[in-house]
């Protein structure tokens, strides 16, 4: 990934964080890494952990289509690792934020 793509991704995640905070989410972690993968944002709202995948584009296509079953399985493995590491047994869900030319789409509790 080049510097331009890195900056675009970082700024997109900043937009997502501002969106989540404005909707009452507490941001716990950003870019949580494990050997299985990465979670872009981990947040909490109403005692539920939210593991949020952020995808952004400046082109005309639907960002949600970029989450494949392979990517989703990596997200789930990383969630298991996070919960085990933090010894935090609580309800959780996987959410998605898509950013397309300043338009934000928020899809809660996704599954494949």
From Swiss-Prot:
PANTHER family per record: UPF0102 PROTEIN YRAN
Source organism of this protein record: Campylobacter hominis (strain ATCC BAA-381 / DSM 21671 / CCUG 45161 / LMG 19568 / NCTC 13146 / CH001A)
The organism's taxonomic lineage, starting at the top: Bacteria, Pseudomonadati, Campylobacterota, Epsilonproteobacteria, Campylobacterales
NCBIfam families, per database record: PRK12497.2-4
UniProt xrefs under InterPro entries: Restrct_endonuc-II-like (IPR011335), tRNA_endonuc-like_dom_sf (IPR011856), UPF0102_YraN-like (IPR003509)
Family under the similarity heading: Belongs to the UPF0102 family.
Organism superkingdom: Bacteria
Cited Pfam families: UPF0102 (PF02021)
Name recorded for this polypeptide: UPF0102 protein CHAB381_0216
Single Gene Ontology MF annotation: nucleic acid binding
């Amino acid at each position: 990934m080049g510097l331009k793509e890195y900056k675009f991704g970082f700024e997109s995640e900043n937009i997502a964080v501002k969106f989540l905070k404005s909707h009452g989410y507490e941001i716990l972690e950003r870019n949580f890494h494990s050997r299985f993968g990465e979670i872009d944002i981990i947040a909490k709202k109403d005692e539920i952990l939210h593991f949020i995948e952020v995808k952004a584009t400046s082109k005309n296509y639907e960002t949600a289509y970029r989450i494949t079953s392979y990517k989703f399985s990596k997200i789930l493995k990383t969630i298991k690792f996070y919960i085990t590491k933090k010894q935090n047994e609580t309800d959780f869900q996987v959410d998605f934020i898509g950013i397309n030319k300043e338009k934000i789409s928020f899809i809660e509790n996704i599954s494949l």
